[in-house]
Amino acid sequence: KPLKRVTESDMDQCMKLNVYSAISAIQGFQENLKNNNGSIVLFSSVAAQKGFANHTIIASAKAALEGLTVTLAAEFAPSIRVNCLAPSLTESKISQSMLKSEVVAEALAKAHPLKRLGKGNDSASIAKFLLSDESSWITGQIIGVDGGRSRLS
């Protein structure tokens, strides 16, 4: 939604859903994570760093999660690793209405260097890796899962 239509209530709702809920969940599990050399994976969006028109609300909330990621990675090291995935548009129930039109879906896919939209497994497999011991030397990272959209033309 354009900035001129953004309300404080819109911002509050998005921040509660994305940032405050993450903080609350992490606080609730912090001791358990610390005692078990745990790992946290947060979810941002390519919109937090790329800059898209009409993404004021979600980009702000997701950028806050990216800040939270690096701050908590520093605070919790060495006992808890914290990373963040930043996917681009992914085929899902949430994006279904946007992708109804084949023309729109094709245009959105072409905006990505890999010429397709994301699938749930694209992010899930990386999250699984980050939560495993195989990623024991990775923390404080924002990882684009975006078909190259954030870094390539």
List each language-model region with its residue ranges.
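Short C-terminal tail/terminal secondary-structure segment
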Residues: 50, 128, 139-153
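Substrate-binding pocket helix/loop in short-chain dehydrogenase/reductase
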Residues: 1-3, 7-12, 104-108
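Residue(s) in the substrate-gating loop at a strand-loop-helix junction
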Residues: 45
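Active-site loop-to-helix junction immediately N-terminal to the catalytic Tyr of the SDR YXXXK motif
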Residues: 6, 51-59, 71
